[in-house]
């Protein structure tokens, strides 16, 4: 009820794993694509109530990624690709700010969309 009253915004998170077909990530990619599908349907169903729903697919440096790098440096080097921009995104600055923008009234007409914030990673072969 509050979402209808507030004409709010919903921002869900998915992953490039589903968009780009990352090797060895079948279950993870399927789950994240489910989020994208759910979000598109919600955007259609909730649009008449002036609720917009979008998805962000981030690639950010996280504590878990850092733990993996420290625990398994060779596996990290072999398996974790660096985006073309040469660094992973900063969760607060490069991911968080786009989420704030998506929740602003200026972006109200944007709904059912997927935004990637992955430093060009999707351009890699």
Which stretches of residues belong to each language-model region?
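A short helix-coil junction within the Rossmann-fold of NAD(P)-dependent oxidoreductases
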Residues: 1-9
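Active-site loop immediately N-terminal to the catalytic Tyr-X3-Lys motif
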Residues: 7, 20-26, 48, 86, ...
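Residue(s) in the substrate-gating loop at a strand-loop-helix junction
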Residues: 15
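Short C-terminal tail/terminal secondary-structure segment
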Residues: 20, 99, 111-125
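Active-site helix of classical SDR
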Residues: 31, 39
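Short, small/polar-rich loop/turn modules that mediate ligand/substrate recognition or access, typified
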Residues: 47, 52, 110-112
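Conserved SDR Rossmann-fold cofactor-binding beta-strand/turn motif
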Residues: 52-60, 103, 116-118
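Catalytic Tyr-x(3-8)-Lys segment
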Residues: 74-93
């Amino acid at each position: 009820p509050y979402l209808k009253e507030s004409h709010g915004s919903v921002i869900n998170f998915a992953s490039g794993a589903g968009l780009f077909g990352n090797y060895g990530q079948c279950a993870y990619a399927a789950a994240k694509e489910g989020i994208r599908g759910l979000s598109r349907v919600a955007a259609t169903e909730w649009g008449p109530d002036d609720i917009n729903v979008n998805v962000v697919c981030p690639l950010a440096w996280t504590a878990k990624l850092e733990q993996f790098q420290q625990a398994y440096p060779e596996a990290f080097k072999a398996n974790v690709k660096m985006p073309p921009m040469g660094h992973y995104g900063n969760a607060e600055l490069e991911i968080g700010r786009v989420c704030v923008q998506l929740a602003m009234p200026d972006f109200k007409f944007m709904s059912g969309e997927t935004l990637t914030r992955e430093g060009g990673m999707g351009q890699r072969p």
